[in-house]
């Protein structure tokens, strides 16, 4: 009964939190929006303990699954495990996600607040996604190529990918290796556990168990299988970006460029500079730089319409997955 009441309380708070922006003109929602939603969600400077909710959730689920394994299933399946699995493989695979997860949280990426000498000049400006001599509107420092300001970390992150809520840290120059290792170690543990548990359950004659033990095996198998699929899909998208030589932040920028190409609005002048073409009645066009900081209207007479992404070179792509991976973790 107590758990049910707690569940109802949590669900009601989540519903109020999600609906308060849309119905903030209503009394109860207005109060919730002003006193809870704004300080908890919109204001990153207040209640910063909120950023640890997701890491604690991950650790709770992880601990629960380990508890089920050792308290309810290990004794059942141990006769079918080899000594290497029992004393080396399983303990090691249980430790690695915690180790790499901790390192991903602790190791901060290079940023405008703290970075190695020269790291801010590591990448050239491509004059399509990134432009020189731009000052970050928030931290008031020159923005290096491939950087992005993070409102949670309150700094410009070099080689910025994204702010990961699972580790409460930005993924960027200096901690890609730990983040990728965190993903892979979790995927390895989950997939191994799922496959091993399924194999064991198909050989029920080799062990004796109670209905409770059978239920625990089933719960653990479902959890491992579900998380394996989710994490495998996510890892695929992460490493597909690596293969393309781009970050998550750059993927969104490239998507915008591709949208302009599809509509025939991205053009290039004889000097190789890119502009966005806007129709201004009839055959009249206005031209603006792809630089969001530059609001100047340009007059261009001679230009070439970019018709395919293949006509644009991603100067940050090193040609293959291995070289790009070295670039990220190097």
From Swiss-Prot:
Residues 134-184 form the DHHC domain. Its EC number is 2.3.1.225. The keyword RNA-binding does not apply. Residues 72-86, 203-218 are lumenal. It is a multi-pass membrane protein. Pfam families: DHHC. The chain crosses the membrane at residues 1-21, 51-71, 87-107, 182-202, 219-239. One of its GO terms (biological process) is regulation of exocytosis. The keyword Transmembrane applies. It is an enzyme of class 2 (transferase). It is found in: Endoplasmic reticulum membrane. Keywords: Acyltransferase, Endoplasmic reticulum, Lipoprotein, Membrane, Palmitate, Transferase, Transmembrane, Transmembrane helix. GO terms for molecular function: protein-cysteine S-palmitoyltransferase activity. It catalyses: L-cysteinyl-[protein] + hexadecanoyl-CoA = S-hexadecanoyl-L-cysteinyl-[protein] + CoA. One of its GO terms (cellular component) is actin cortical patch. InterPro entries: Palmitoyltrfase_DHHC, PFA4/ZDH16/20/ERF2-like. Residues 22-50, 108-181, 240-330 are cytoplasmic. Palmitoyltransferase that targets several endosomal SNAREs. Palmitoylates the SNAREs at cysteine residues close to the cytoplasmic end of their transmembrane domain. May have a role in the cellular quality control of transmembrane domain-containing proteins. Belongs to the DHHC palmitoyltransferase family. SWF1 subfamily. The DHHC domain is required for palmitoyltransferase activity. This is Palmitoyltransferase SWF1. It comes from Candida glabrata (strain ATCC 2001 / BCRC 20586 / JCM 3761 / NBRC 0622 / NRRL Y-65 / CBS 138). The lineage of its organism: Eukaryota, Fungi, Dikarya, Ascomycota, Saccharomycotina.
């Amino acid at each position: 009964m107590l758990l049910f009441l707690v569940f109802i309380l949590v669900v009601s708070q989540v519903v109020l939190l999600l609906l308060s922006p849309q119905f903030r003109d209503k009394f109860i929602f207005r109060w919730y929006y002003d006193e809870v939603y704004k300080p908890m969600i919109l204001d990153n400077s207040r209640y910063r303990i909120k950023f640890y909710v997701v890491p604690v959730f991950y650790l709770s689920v992880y601990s629960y699954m380990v508890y089920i394994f050792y308290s309810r299933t290990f004794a059942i399946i141990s006769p079918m495990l080899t000594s290497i699995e029992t004393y080396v493989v399983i303990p090691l695979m249980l430790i690695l996600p915690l180790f790499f997860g901790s390192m991903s949280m602790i190791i901060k990426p290079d940023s405008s607040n703290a970075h190695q000498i020269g790291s801010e000049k590591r990448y050239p400006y491509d004059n399509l996604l990134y432009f020189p001599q731009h000052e970050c509107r928030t931290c008031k420092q020159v923005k290096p190529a491939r950087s992005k300001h993070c409102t949670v970390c309150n700094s410009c992150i070099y080689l910025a990918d994204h702010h990961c809520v699972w580790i409460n840290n930005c993924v960027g120059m200096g901690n890609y290796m730990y983040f990728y290792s965190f993903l892979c170690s979790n995927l390895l543990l989950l997939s191994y556990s799922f496959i091993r548990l399924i194999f064991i359950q198909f050989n029920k004659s080799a062990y004796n168990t109670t209905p409770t033990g059978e239920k625990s095996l089933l719960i653990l198998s479902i959890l491992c299988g579900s998380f394996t699929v989710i994490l495998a899909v996510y890892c695929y998208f992460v490493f597909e970006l690596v293969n393309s030589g781009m970050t998550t932040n750059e993927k969104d920028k490239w998507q915008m460029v591709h949208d302009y190409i599809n509509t025939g609005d991205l053009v290039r002048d004889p000097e190789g500079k890119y502009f966005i073409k806007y129709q201004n009645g009839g055959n009249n066009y206005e031209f603006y730089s792809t630089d969001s900081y530059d609001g100047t209207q340009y007059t261009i007479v001679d230009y070439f319409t970019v018709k395919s992404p293949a006509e644009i070179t991603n100067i940050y792509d090193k040609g293959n997955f291995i070289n790009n991976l070295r670039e990220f973790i190097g």
